[in-house]
Curated annotation (Swiss-Prot):
Keywords: Cell membrane, Membrane
Family: Belongs to the GtfB family.
Organism this protein belongs to: Streptococcus gordonii
Subunit description: Forms a heterotetramer with 2 subunits each of GtfA and GtfB. Part of the accessory SecA2/SecY2 protein translocation apparatus required to export cell wall protein GspB.
Gene designation per UniProt: gtfB
Protein name (record): UDP-N-acetylglucosamine--peptide N-acetylglucosaminyltransferase stabilizing protein GtfB
Cell compartments where the protein resides: Cell membrane
Pathway(s) annotated for this protein in UniProt: Protein modification; protein glycosylation
GO cellular component: plasma membrane; protein N-acetylglucosaminyltransferase complex
Length: 450
């Protein structure tokens, strides 16, 4: 059994963690050449580049090599390389939550068109470069071994992939699927079950194994619209494929799929959420956290005045404006300007409520972090940054700060009230007990696989 994913993102991580919690610890492959994959995941592209030596030491944004006298400037969202005021490159971070660590550098020509992308890994090494013909049209990507040798060249126009390994004949693959199949066979992985979450390359790999004994499962983690995707309909129509089950974690998406599928095909769909490993319990403390880039915090004065028993802890990664600093006139407001990542982590541990009420961009994936720490999350419709983790009954119009305060006050009345509110939050995020995850997968796969 293997887990096979096209990309690494939060949904992939949630599925992977749920499978691990249920006892399905099997090789996990991410097709995307991501230099910041967790240690228990591997990409076919980076596998052939050789082992990275030493501990993780990602490149910080101002360590990107640039020509003399060029300038690097950055904030917590993105960084830029400039030459005499002209933008020459954009630096993308691996993750907001991890600080300004470099994942990719996009180099621009004098017309501002993308010409070259350099990808970095968590050891701070540039391991791949993608050349562009015009703007956004990628031409080829070259992957470099740890000793700087060209190891893989992928032509994005023809689809060919050339693999050069020491003391082995040069190999040419006509498609990415062929390359992935070679990788799987080289590792001699058991392909009796493939658990995958994409109808792109992951599905094509499964489809290429049609006729070979095995039972695969698609975990569909994307929205559905007016019709089912073509490859999903192919699964429903073809009983000869290895994939005969489509698991959908999101309840609303599952219900949409059932409404779009023919009656005799609906049995192929199954709803099964995620098992989240919450970092701690909620202790019912009257401490509310707000992370913000902006001094525009919806309904703040009303909430602070309506809930004098609640301490509002407001943190920013930068200096705060006079408007925000004036909130110190309230005894139940504590401000943290120029807060460090370590300090923010501590604030999550000290708070049991998160208010998603700041305008502007989200800070450090704040809503998800609050959810992981079992904080009760409430917000206004006009300021939401990630509604996936906020129960509908905890979302209010910005003209209703009094209603938000009332629900918050009710949740703080006692353990049962807070438990009920957190259960609603978990249901909305499709949280399920690990026992249900185990039972469902055992019924599909016939037992645990490790």
């Amino acid at each position: 059994m293997i887990q096979l994913f096209d990309y690494y993102n939060q949904e992939t991580q949630d599925l992977h963690d749920s499978l691990l919690a249920a006892g399905y610890a099997c090789p996990t492959i991410v097709i995307e050449a991501n230099g910041f994959l967790p240690d228990d995941m591997i990409s076919p592209y980076t596998y052939f580049l050789g082992d990275e030596e030493g501990v993780d030491h990602p490149l910080f944004f101002n360590q990107v090599p640039v020509p003399p006298f060029w300038e690097i400037t950055g904030d917590h969202q993105v960084a830029r390389v400039s030459d005499m005021g002209e933008e020459r490159a954009r630096i993308h971070y691996a993750s907001q939550a991890r600080g300004r660590l470099v994942k990719q550098v996009d180099w621009l020509d004098k017309k501002g068109q993308l010409r070259l992308s350099e990808r970095y890994n968590k050891q701070g090494r540039c391991f791949a470069k993608t050349a562009y013909k015009s703007g956004q049209e990628a031409f080829n990507t070259t992957y470099y071994s740890t000793d700087g040798q060209e190891r893989i060249v992928e032509n994005h126009v023809t689809g060919d992939i050339i693999l050069t390994l020491d003391q082995e004949p040069l190999r040419i693959f006509k498609s990415r699927v062929d390359f992935i199949r070679f990788f799987l066979e080289r590792l001699d992985l058991d392909l009796d079950h493939i658990l995958f979450n994409s109808l792109a390359y992951s599905f094509l790999v499964s489809h290429s194994l049609t006729g070979r004994a095995g039972q695969d499962i698609l975990f569909w983690q994307e929205p559905l619209y007016d019709e089912l995707p073509g490859n999903m309909q192919l699964i429903l129509d073809n009983s000869q494929l290895r994939t005969q089950t489509i698991v959908i974690p999101d309840l609303a998406t599952y219900e949409k799929a059932m409404s779009l599928a023919a009656a005799d095909q609906q049995q192929k769909f199954l709803h099964l959420g995620y098992h989240y490993d919450f970092k701690r319990d909620n202790y019912l403390r009257k401490d509310a956290l707000i992370l913000t880039h902006s001094d525009q915090i919806e309904g703040l004065d009303t909430l602070v005045q309506s809930l004098p028993q609640l301490v509002f802890r407001i943190a920013a990664l930068t200096e705060m404006s006079p408007k925000l600093l004036s909130m110190l006139s309230y005894k139940n407001v504590v401000l943290y300007q120029n807060a460090s990542l370590k300090q923010i982590e501590q604030l999550y541990l000290e708070s049991d409520i998160y208010l998603d009420i700041n305008h502007g961009g989200q800070v450090l994936q704040a809503v998800r972090k609050a959810f992981e720490n079992n904080l009760l999350i409430l917000g206004f419709e006009q300021t939401l940054h990630d509604r996936h983790y906020i129960a509908q009954q905890h979302i209010f119009d910005s003209s209703q700060p009094a209603q938000l305060a009332s629900i918050l006050e009710e949740a703080l009345c006692g353990v049962e009230q807070m438990r009920s509110a957190l259960q609603a939050q978990g249901r909305h995020a499709n949280d399920v007990p690990v026992s249900l995850y185990q039972e469902t997968l055992q019924s599909l796969l016939g037992g645990q696989h490790g």
